[in-house]
Design a protein with these regions (language model features):
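PRY/SPRY (B30.2) beta-sandwich protein-interaction domains
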Residues: 1-182
């Protein structure tokens, strides 16, 4: 700098770390969504969300969004209530103004039965149904490629259902946020 505030390495190697994703965590934003209280209880720095029973049709959204690129998030289903829950992605055309199922791709799951399905808010219907049940402790992964218009769900590291494809025009110009509903 102009004031001779220059830094030197005393030992070891200096590593330039621009664009390094380490220690950047996308957490839930308790200021987005509707009916956050009593619908959800946030803890662990907004990395843990517990659904109330009933959850009162509450939404929760991630605090970081994106318009292009590839993204992956994992959710641990620590426990199930009797409610039906949804985990997936929602695409916004601007500042969030509505909390509805339009512009979504969701994995729907419940405590009992084979009601698990992949839902599209772009078409207003189920893309895949009668999927195998989940268990408490399962890790649900969501991989999204915004540019190529794909979404793939995972359970405990294995693909769960078929990849959702052909969504590039639906995703274009919209901001992705990971979302939960219950």
């Amino acid at each position: 700098s102009g004031n001779s505030n220059n830094f030197t390495v005393a030992g070891g190697t200096l590593t330039k770390s621009e664009d390094c994703p380490s220690d950047v965590f996308n957490t839930f934003n308790r200021n987005l969504g509707n009916n956050l209280v009593p619908g959800f209880t946030f803890s662990n720095g907004n990395n843990t969300v517990a659904f109330a029973t009933p959850a009162n049709d509450s939404w929760g959204f991630s605090n970081l969004g994106a318009f292009s690129g590839k993204y992956y998030a994992e959710f641990k289903a620590a426990a199930f209530s009797a409610n039906t829950h949804y985990i997936g992605v929602k695409f916004f055309t601007g500042i969030m103004s509505t909390d509805n199922f339009s512009n979504t791709i969701f994995l729907r799951f419940a405590k009992t039965g084979n009601t698990n399905a992949i839902y599209s808010g772009f078409t207003g219907g189920f893309l895949q149904q009668n999927m195998t049940s989940l268990s408490a402790g399962d890790i649900i992964g969501v991989a999204v490629d915004i540019d190529n218009g794909t979404v793939q769900f995972y359970v405990n590291g294995a693909t769960y259902g078929n990849q959702v494809t052909g969504q590039a025009s639906n995703f274009a110009g919209k901001q992705l946020q990971f979302a939960i509903f219950g």
